[in-house]
Amino acid sequence: MRLRLLHSLFLFIPFQLMAGTVVYTDAEHPPQNLTEESSVVWLDGPDRLQDSIFGQLAADPQLAAQQAREIIQSPQWPGQQEQIAQAYRQVVHAWEIGLHKFPAVVFDDRDAVYGTSDVARAATLRSQGGK
């Protein structure tokens, strides 16, 4: 729980706008037909990263705290911490641009095509005015 609080503090670090084409999705809706100009924001990324870093901590709170301290004190932690912070910033950005549901393909932080993680299909729907 303290770890989540620690990570939430990194949400206030400035985040650069993600111009271009961005697929907002999760592991159950993999992106398709990505272009060189497109990028992916994994909305389940923070949880998946934390799970991969911390694994299954012990049920005993004292032992779990010790395990977490060992991870946080490891030489790999600064890089892992930055990865988690970046993943949270991307999720916050999705919320800031008003993303209502996912998967979605967002063009220039303005136009969203919901219900697909396929960049080509989203571009076609967008060019047809959503018809």
Model-derived features: positions:
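Sec-dependent signal peptide recognition
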Residues: 2-11
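C-terminal partner/receptor-binding element of secreted or periplasmic proteins
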Residues: 115-131
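Aromatic- and Gly/Pro-rich amphipathic surface segment
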Residues: 55-85
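Extracytoplasmic/secreted cell-surface and envelope-processing proteins
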Residues: 32-33, 113-115
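A short, hydrophobic beta-strand/beta-hairpin element that forms part of a small beta-sheet core
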Residues: 102-113
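N-terminal signal peptide c-region/cleavage motif recognized by signal peptidases
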Residues: 14-16
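Local sequence-structure signature of Cys/Sec-based thiol-disulfide redox active-site neighborhoods
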Residues: 18-58, 107
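Thioredoxin-like thiol-disulfide oxidoreductase module
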Residues: 76-100
